[in-house]
Amino acid sequence: MTSNSFINRLKSNQKVSFKDTISTINESYQYTPTSFINGLGEQAVTNAAGTNEGSCKIFAFAQLQQLDQQQTLSLFGDYYQDVLNDPNGTSHQNIRNFMRYGWAGIQFKGKNTLRLK
């Protein structure tokens, strides 16, 4: 699926899966592992380059596409639903921090995490 078709599905509130999100990103973009911080203050999570690559790809893609917080969370598919089903849990910390801090909490340590193929 092209990234434009995928974004149209997302913006029309059709459910998307994590697998479809990553597949769409991989089809359209060249990925460079990049470290990033998610969150603010003591709650910030530092993700080293090459770790949590799904989250890194999704946040970079959403940023390029200028998606809002809710649209970005939807890209995580069932993982986002897992967090909603367990609001006091500790799994999927990148999703939890993004729910709390939004785009203000995302900081990439490098540029060009994703480039069009």
Which ranges hold each PLM region?
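Short, surface-exposed loop/turn motifs that are enriched in glycine and acidic residues
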Residues: 7-15, 44-48
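Short, charge-rich, low-complexity alpha-helical interaction segments
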Residues: 13-36
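Short coil/turn segments at secondary-structure boundaries
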Residues: 37-41, 112
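Amphipathic protein-protein interaction modules
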Residues: 42-93
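Long, compositionally biased
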Residues: 90-117
